[in-house]
Design a protein with these regions (language model features):
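Feature captures the catalytic cores and cofactor-binding loops of soluble hydro-lyases/lyases
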Residues: 3-12, 19-132
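Phosphate/diphosphate-binding glycine-rich loops and adjacent basic-rich segments that engage nucleotide
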Residues: 131-139
């Protein structure tokens, strides 16, 4: 098992298969709330489901309403269990993650997206501003 330190944004712990995207993701328009399926123009993950995954993306694109879409994914049971980004996430996404109890980590000390593939089992833990990413193996 490999451990990587990261900056913690939203506290919590979760584990699941990684869903790795090469583009920025917006919960406002890129993800279908009713199904959790990625429907936006994201070629690396188009038609994949975010449900139960640890999302690993370069960054998030948000808007004033993005928090509501992430929270609605949670209410429908179609939410990711955690989010890891290369850079700080959009504030609206952070707001939605707080409401939905989805841990967020950013700025990992090692580039996670280049290290693992979609489907690899990943666990995260965030306490305060400290985060740990544990790469557990294939899911």
């Amino acid at each position: 098992m490999k451990e990587i330190a990261a900056r913690g944004i939203v506290e919590g712990a979760a584990a699941g298969p990684a869903l790795i995207g090469d583009e920025a993701i917006s919960f406002l328009g890129d993800v279908d709330i009713a199904t959790g399926q990625i429907v936006g123009d994201l070629p690396s993950v188009r038609n994949a489901s975010v449900r139960g995954t640890v999302l690993i993306f370069p960054y998030t694109r948000g808007s004033a309403g993005a928090w509501r879409f992430l929270y609605q994914l949670y209410k429908h049971g179609n939410h990711p269990v955690a989010i890891i980004t290369d850079s700080a996430p959009d504030p609206s996404v952070v707001q939605g993650a707080i409401l939905a109890k989805i841990p967020i980590l950013c700025e990992p000390t090692t580039a996670v997206r280049g290290l693992i593939a979609t489907g690899t089992r990943v666990a995260v833990e965030v306490t305060g501003d400290k985060g740990v990413i544990r790469i557990e193996g294939t899911g």
